[in-house]
Structure formats: structure tokens, C-alpha cells
Amino acid sequence: MPVDLAALVAPGHTALLTVEVQDNVIGDASILPDLARAATTIVPNIATLARAARAAGVPVVHGTAETRPDRLGSNNNARLFAATAKLRPRGAPGPAPTAVLHAGIGAEPGDLVMPRLHGLS
């Protein structure tokens, strides 16, 4: 039986979710340069999806990985956490550099940005 795609993605119960599409993950400032190079081809596609979702009234939600200035809630049980800790020394003021969305995607005023302070995705 064919799936009714229009009903499946109706704006009333659908959202576009991006996860960690941030400068320090897939951008020029990435601590994972191989990942950033591999992601260059998907950034325009994500941006196109986000524009289409907004135009259709579908919420766009950006899940970001962030740290508090005091690093409370931050894990240290993976090598990736040690690498990201160097980006934001304990007590550094202002937003975490990893919280900046990739410039090719960005957040529009109506988008939701949902920070995550611990764990890996």
C-alpha cells in the first residue's frame, strides 16, 4: 500500500531537526577536519531543506552541543570531550564557540535552537 507522503510530513506534526551542524563540528573551525571536509556536500542540502521547511510552515529545530562557562554538566569520559575542552577553557566568558551554527545553514528568527550540555549524539 502506498504511503501518503503529504500526510506523513504535514506541518502540524512535523519538524526538521538538525543536529550539531555547527562551525566547530562541520565548519571551517572544526576540530574534526576530515568530518568537515566530508560535510561540505551536505551543507547546501541541509540549507535547502531548512528553507523549504520554513516556507511550508514546518518548524526548524537545531540541536547544538554546548558547554557552560564553568563546564558543569560536561562529560570527560571520551577523547572527543578532551578535544572540545581545549576550545573552551573553564570560566571562558560568552557563548561556547561550538554553539555557532554553520554559516551555510544558520538559524532564522523563528527557528528553535536547543542546546545540549552533556553526552554525545
What is the predicted function of each stretch?
Residues 106-107, 112-121:
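Glycine-rich oxoanion-binding loops at beta->alpha junctions
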Residues 1-108:
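Active-site acidic carboxylates
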